[in-house]
Regions:
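C-terminal catalytic domains of large/alpha subunits in multi-subunit enzymes
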Residues: 1-166
Length: 166
C-alpha cells in the first residue's frame, strides 16, 4: 500500500509570551475560593483569526482554573483510579468562572515562520493555574494570614481552611 512518513523539525520554535492576573475572594470561615476577575494578555504574533484565538484562550483559562481549584485524580492502593467519572471528578461549570478580559493586541511577528504566528492553543491552560494559586495566597496574606505561603493544588476549600487554621 501507499505509505508516507514526514517529520517537521524547525530550527527555531515559536513561543508566545503573556501575563495573567487573577482576582479571587476567599471565605476564611469555609475556605471557599471564588474567581472574581481574570485578565489574560498574550503576544501570539500575527493573529489570523482573533475570534478563534480568544476562544482558545477562554477554553484554556477554564481548564487552568479547574486544575487550580477543583480537579484531582485519586487512586486506591492498587493504582485503580477512584475519580474516573463525572460523578466524582470535579470540573468548573460556567457559573464557577468569571467573565475574562482577554487581550492579544500586542502582535510581535515571529521571525521563524512565514506567517509570523506563534502558538496560542494552550496558553490559557499554562498561565492560569499559577495565577489562581498566587491570587489565593495573596488574598490570604491581605486577610492577615501571612503564615500561609503554599497550598497544594487543587486549592480546595478544605485545603484553604486547613492552611488558614494551621
Amino acid at each position: 500500500g501507499l505509505e508516507e512518513t514526514a517529520f517537521y523539525d524547525p530550527a527555531n520554535f515559536t513561543y508566545p509570551a503573556g501575563a495573567y492576573a487573577c482576582e479571587v475572594e476567599v471565605d476564611p470561615d469555609t475556605g471557599k475560593v471564588s474567581v472574581e476577575r481574570f485578565t489574560a494578555v498574550d503576544d501570539f504574533g500575527n493573529v489570523i483569526n482573533p475570534m478563534i484565538v480568544t476562544g482558545q484562550v477562554h477554553g484554556g483559562l477554564a481548564q487552568g482554573i479547574g486544575q487550580a481549584l477543583l480537579e484531582n485524580c485519586t487512586y486506591d492502593e492498587n493504582g485503580q483510579i477512584l475519580s474516573g467519572s463525572f460523578m466524582d471528578y470535579a470540573m468548573p461549570r460556567a457559573s464557577d468562572l468569571p467573565l475574562y478580559a482577554v487581550d492579544h493586541s500586542c502582535q510581535t511577528p515571529c521571525t521563524h515562520n512565514p506567517l509570523g504566528v506563534k502558538g496560542c492553543g494552550e496558553a490559557g491552560a499554562i498561565g492560569s493555574p499559577p495565577a489562581v494559586v498566587n491570587a489565593v495566597i495573596n488574598a490570604l496574606h491581605s486577610g492577615g494570614h501571612t503564615h500561609v505561603t503554599h497550598i497544594d493544588m487543587p486549592v480546595s476549600p478544605s485545603r484553604v481552611w486547613a492552611a488558614i487554621n494551621s
